[in-house]
Amino acid sequence: MNSFTYDYPVRNYFGEGAMDQALDAEMGAMGRTVMLAYGGGSVKRTGVYGHVVDKLTSAGKRVVDFGGIMPNPTYEKCQEGAALAREEQVDFILAVGGGSVFDCCKVVSAQAMLDEDIETFEHADGKMPSSFIPMGCIVTLSGTGAEQNNGAVITNEETHVKGAYLGAMPMWAALDPALTLTVPHAQFMSGAFDTLSHCMESYFGSPRGRNVTDDINLAIQRNVIRNMRIIADDNQNLEALSELVYDSAMAENGVLKIGKSTDFQAHMIQHQYGAYTHTNHGMGLAVIHPALYRHLAPEAPAQFARWAREVWGVDAKGKDDLTVALEGIDRLQTFIGEMGLPTSFAEMGSDASDETLHKVADTCVLTGGCAKKLERSEVFQILTECL
């Protein structure tokens, strides 16, 4: 393992009633003016929005509404939120939803405290914000684990770049699995695959020998797969939903990255594909992973073979590591189809042109943590194999 320092500041409230437990415990630290941030209308239809507003107003808080945060949140939306937070002198940001809402609010929290544009501050000047409006998260859609860290992925619609930002670290997160019962099935499965993707991208980093971080990772992957299969048959199974909500948190709270240099190449490709096509993140990952891994497995056959044996139950007797690895990738792709997720861009309803695929390949970040650093020509080849 690599050397590391691990500091985990997010306070988690998990289980039935976690939302109220968190609000009651944290209300005193929220200040007078609370920005309530959310996505579309689902939080209002389910009653979560009204319940949270009632709790806040009953405690004497002034509520500032910041809704309409879209999937794949835009830089413009983040700037809108930051301007509102400054204008209303917001003391606390309460983000209700999933990864897109949380990512947007992390950037809002930082931008509201900066005198200059955060994109220039971070990307051009290489500086990191140090002052934030404090924030908390209520999870109604799991999968991204975004409530567990300070990373954010934001789309700049002018440049078609889906870029990474560092914003606020949430002070706390409420994870009540019952709040995910109303999530549409396809959307939930997409989020669950994002969790599996986070695990795989951490596992396939380096070092590639056996270590306790990878042991934990492979166990979580098995748990995600087992519970996705349960949800595929019974999407109201609260126990399986609970497992997947916690799996999502574990995948992104840093535990699976301890002592590792991670590989997030699939995410980098999907980020740019999504920036150009506005397609669903988790579904795009489901399409990209098998194609990408068929290119990476020959460079790290032992690592892929272990994953194939321990996660997918591939019988390795009489087979070399690469054969075992490729069989594991085939099982991953079969599983994706069984879960009702797409196995090609065409199944997603996406028909990107060669020109678009070249733009994606030419602009996506190439990571150095995976089995090999891809050339852009190979990224284009992978994308064509996803069609």
Model-based region annotation:
Residues 51-52, 80-82, 101-115, 148-151:
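Short Gly/Thr/Asp-enriched flexible loops that form oxyanion-binding sites at enzyme active sites
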